[in-house]
């Protein structure tokens, strides 16, 4: 079963652009080098929060992502640039209705 993660980040206002750049760099590396990464999509909320929606093929793909250099580089690049700790939620789907519309 695929694993979906939502990571929410609140950048310090003066570091917003640097945080976005770091996330975009990590996004490109995940897309290019992680076969089991099915989705790694950055979005911005209307309140300025940044949300990375991630989907991994399985536990092994998530483990590879977690152990990869791109994530370590991202964590280092974000040091001191967030106003609160990153909120990471590992989600379990509860599909209803049409399967294609009820899960990520």
What are these regions (language model features)?
Residues 2, 41-48, 74-104:
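Glycine-rich beta-strand-turn "strand-cap" elements at beta-sheet edges
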Residues 3-9:
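Active-site-flanking beta-strand signature of metal-NTP-handling nucleotidyl enzymes
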Residues 5, 36, 46:
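Exposed loop/turn and edge beta-strand positions of beta-sandwich/beta-sheet ligand-binding modules
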Residues 10-20:
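Short, surface-exposed ligand-recognition loops at beta-strand->loop->(often short) alpha-helix junctions
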Residues 12-14, 45, 57-59:
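Short coil/turn motifs at secondary-structure junctions
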Residues 20-21, 41:
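Short, 15-30-residue, compositionally biased linear elements
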Residues 25-39, 55-89:
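An amphipathic, aromatic/His-enriched active-site/gating alpha helix that lines ligand/cofactor pockets
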């Amino acid at each position: 079963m695929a694993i979906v993660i939502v990571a929410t980040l609140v950048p310090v206002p003066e570091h917003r652009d640097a945080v976005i750049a770091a996330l975009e760099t990590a996004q490109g590396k995940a897309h290019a080098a992680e076969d089991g990464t099915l989705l790694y999509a950055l979005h911005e909320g209307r309140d300025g929060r940044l949300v990375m929606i991630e989907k991994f093929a399985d536990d092994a793909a998530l483990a590879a992502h977690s152990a990869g250099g791109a994530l370590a580089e991202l964590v280092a690049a974000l040091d001191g640039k967030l106003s609160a700790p990153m909120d990471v939620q590992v989600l379990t789907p509860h599909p209803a209705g049409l399967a294609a519309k009820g899960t990520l």
